[in-house]
């Protein structure tokens, strides 16, 4: 179960119980018996978020129509997030004295012609810019809401509120964060670093590998790794849900 959903059977059972307590399960059409029960609806949504498989292939697995899977994903993805909203820390929940490593990542989407702001010149593709933070042990600490892909990491970081809440000297970033008061590698002309600067940059980069590993783990939810295919209006709620699931599975 874990390989297809990202959660253990015990975690799924607990998640189903949380949703049952919400009493917000989508109503079935009048006079119709639900095609999938609560447990299977949760599993379907998890499989989609974890693997980003086509709805048709998931429909074949559960012996239902593609439309049923489409409705299930649309209805239950936000419910998963609601059931786990207490698992996701906000900026205000973070310890102001806890050193954090921060980095931005692009979550790819389709190239909608009507949304040129999604194009990232840095990554040469379209998507949403998300800021991720972890502590010095590599524990995930924060995931921001998505911003348009063209947003520079420094601006995106300012928008998260992290710089206002955490002492900037406690934040570690890359060269894109130079000028924000954070600990970053030193920028110099090519081949003009002093030996001391080289040692400093090496020590910073040795720490920053933690956030790269955290982001890689986050993107094992393949819905965040490959082009997002559902309507863009559902993109923010999908990220919110996946963020909650990632925090949940790490703290259960």
Predicted regions and their residues:
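A short, structure-level motif marking secondary-structure boundaries and short turns
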Residues: 30, 39-41, 200
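Short secondary-structure transition/capping motifs
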Residues: 4, 33-34, 47, 62-65
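A short glycine/serine-rich beta->alpha loop
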Residues: 27-34, 228
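Charged, often Cys/His-bearing segments associated with DNA-binding zinc-finger transcription factors
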Residues: 1-30
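Short, amphipathic alpha-helical "recognition" segments used to contact nucleic acids or chromatin
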Residues: 37-51
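Short, well-ordered secondary-structure "scaffold" segments embedded in the functional core
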Residues: 57-252
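Ser/Thr-centered flexible coil motifs
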Residues: 8, 37, 193-196
């Amino acid at each position: 179960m874990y390989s297809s959903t990202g959660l253990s059977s015990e975690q799924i059972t607990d998640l189903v119980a949380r949703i049952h307590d919400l009493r917000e399960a989508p109503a079935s059409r009048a006079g119709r018996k639900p095609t999938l029960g609560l447990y299977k609806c949760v599993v379907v949504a998890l499989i989609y978020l974890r693997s980003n498989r086509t709805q048709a292939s998931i429909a074949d697995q559960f012996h239902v129509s593609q439309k049923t899977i489409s409705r299930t994903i649309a209805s239950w993805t936000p419910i998963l997030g609601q059931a786990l909203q207490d698992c996701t820390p906000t900026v205000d929940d973070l310890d102001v004295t806890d050193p954090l490593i921060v980095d931005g990542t692009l979550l790819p989407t389709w190239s909608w012609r009507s949304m040129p702001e999604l194009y990232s010149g840095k990554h040469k593709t379209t998507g949403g810019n998300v800021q991720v933070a972890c502590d010095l042990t590599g524990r995930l600490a924060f995931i921001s809401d998505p911003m348009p892909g063209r947003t520079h990491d420094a601006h995106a970081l300012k928008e998260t509120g992290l710089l206002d809440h955490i002492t900037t000297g406690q934040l570690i970033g890359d060269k894109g964060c130079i000028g924000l008061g954070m600990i970053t590698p030193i920028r110099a002309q090519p081949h003009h670093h002093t030996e001391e600067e080289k040692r400093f940059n090496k020590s910073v980069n040795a720490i920053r590998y933690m956030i790269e590993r955290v982001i890689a783990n986050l993107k094992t939810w393949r819905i965040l790794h490959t082009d997002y295919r559902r309507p863009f209006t559902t993109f923010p709620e999908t990220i919110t849900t996946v963020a909650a699931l990632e925090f949940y599975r790490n703290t259960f």
